[in-house]
Amino acid sequence: MRYSLLTVVFITASLLSSTVAWSSEVDNIIARKEAPAGVVFEIVSDEADLLGELLPSVKADIQKLRARFPDLPVAIVSHGTEQFALTSKNRSSEIQAHDLVKTLVQSEDVDVHVCGTHAGWYGVSQEDFPDYVDVTAAAPTQIDDYEAIGYELIVLTD
């Protein structure tokens, strides 16, 4: 039991420190006089349920960014184990993640990408994801493409 409690404390502390780090990056962008060309949130983890935990905070940060810069383009790129939460077959077990992503894409004009290469390693194809999730050939290349056009990268990892 003691080992389990220490593990929970460590994981919680790690998530909190990650949240603080990316929140300060968001605050730094908000403090600027001019908006960047866009913002891309990178999520990569080996935690299958991480999207359900992170997306509410990411959505709140997107709202903060857009309160300051209303037309700011935003993208989310997921390319770890967490991306499989967004497969159609996991919709019933990952309702919060699916609902948030669908809202972000359809109502908030946010592009959400998952990695086709990573999916392919596990026998998951583009057709296994719902229409509101874009399956990009390679997530690192997608992120590089965003950065090449001036997007600010905010990395969210476990």
Model segments located where?
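Surface-exposed patches in mature extracellular/periplasmic domains of secreted proteins
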Residues: 65-76, 114-116
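Positively charged n-region of N-terminal signal peptides that target proteins for export
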Residues: 1-5
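Bacterial N-terminal signal peptides
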Residues: 7-18
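Short, glycine-rich nucleotide/cofactor-binding loops
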Residues: 43-55, 88-89
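Boundary at the C-terminal end of the N-terminal hydrophobic targeting segment
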Residues: 21-23
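A cross-taxonomic marker for long C-terminal extensions/tails that follow the last structured domain
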Residues: 87-158
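Acidic helix-start/capping segments at beta-turn-to-alpha-helix junctions
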Residues: 72-86
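Histidine-anchored nucleotide/phosphate-binding helix
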Residues: 53-68
